Amino acid sequence: MHRTYSLRNQRAPTAAELQAPPPPPSSTKSKFFGKASIASSFRKNAAGNFGPELARKLSQLVKTEKGVLRAMEVVASERREAAKQLSLWGADNDDDVSDVTDKLGVLIYELGELQDQFIDKYDQYRVTLKSIRNIEASVQPSRDRKEKITDEIAHLKYKDPQSTKIPVLEQELVRAEAESLVAEAQLSNITREKLKAAYSYMFDSLRELSEKFALIAGYGKALLELLDDSPVTPGEARPAYDGYEASRQIIMDAESALESWTLDMAAVKPTLSFHQTVDDVYEDEDGEEEEEPEIQNGDIPGQVVEEEEVEWTTEVPVDDEAHEADHHVSQNGHTSGSENI
């Protein structure tokens, strides 16, 4: 992970990073204007400097995500162009290379198409974030009004404590606080609702894209198996290529797998090390309590079953005093025996 648990704290390098340092930065990264374009940086800074103060941070996030979308559009377009170039290059090679590169171009072009579809779904996440920003912007005036009235009251109490405007302003402050409470409650509710919906859009679309990318990668590896990469000596001819039907079938299988994929078929399932809700904890505990009476002696592997000792007594009339004496002697003998042990 880029950071440990939080983006707000620097983290120490892991043992794996110390043992195998990451590769140097790509030579295609910008060295003069930073990691973002000038236009993207300008839009983000402008969003953080203008508009209602409450909505500025979220405005910066929305503008940043717009830059992400534009970057993904470029990636999707360039990937499709790269797929075409791969197919054109392979056409001038031997039959096996020509066929495999042509089919690989089909798969790589599909990667660009999937990214293009992902952009449309990703934009729904950004639009939902904008609705939170709009609510924050609408709440800001009520906050400003309440603060303004509070400042006026404090100023009058300091300058002219007997002013007749103070009671009027206090009544206005009560109304402003009531309006602010309603607006703050709406902001709290809508923020949680829209935040959950927005990132559900994003993670569902990201999950779909990742799973489909993994499918295409698997079929791409299958295509590579059709290439005979065994070395040949000078003058030796390679065996004739007969993988046309196999490569065609691989593409058909890939298309069928992508069309039939649904979110329920996702292969990667998250595993959590804690209970999701309190009800889960109580359900597990209740289940354990219900199962406990059903366990009998000998049901648990490795359990030692102790036989019940049965005391055989004969009904012989005994004198009460003699019985008490015998009972006292048996208790003393038991105590001394336990001490010896």
Swiss-Prot record:
Compositional bias of kind Acidic residues: 282-294, 305-323
Processing and modification events after translation? Phosphorylated by PKH1 and PKH2. Phosphorylation is stimulated by sphingolipid long chain bases (LCBs). N-glycosylated.
Gene3D superfamilies cross-referenced by the UniProt entry:
Arfaptin homology (AH) domain/BAR domain
| Region ranges (Disordered) | 1-32, 282-341
**Single GO biological process annotation from the record:** response to heat
Localisation per UniProt entry = Cytoplasm, Cell cortex
Q: Which residues carry this modification: Phosphothreonine?
A: T233
Give residue spans, biased composition: Polar residues: 1-11, 330-341
Q: Which GO terms describe its molecular function?
A: lipid binding
Q: What function does this protein fulfil?
A: Together with PIL1, main component of eisosomes, structures at the cell periphery underneath the plasma membrane that mark the site of endocytosis. Negative regulator of cell wall integrity (CWI) in unstressed cells, probably by inhibiting protein kinase PKH1/PHK2 activity and regulating their downstream CWI pathways PKC1-MAP kinase pathway and protein kinase YPK1 pathway. Activity may be regulated by the transient increase of sphingolipid long chain bases (LCBs) during heat stress.
What other note does the entry give for this protein?
A: Present with 104485 molecules/cell in log phase SD medium.
- What is the protein's name according to its record? Sphingolipid long chain base-responsive protein LSP1
Q: Which organism is it from?
A: Saccharomyces cerevisiae (strain ATCC 204508 / S288c) (Baker's yeast)
- In the UniProt record, the gene name given for this protein reads LSP1
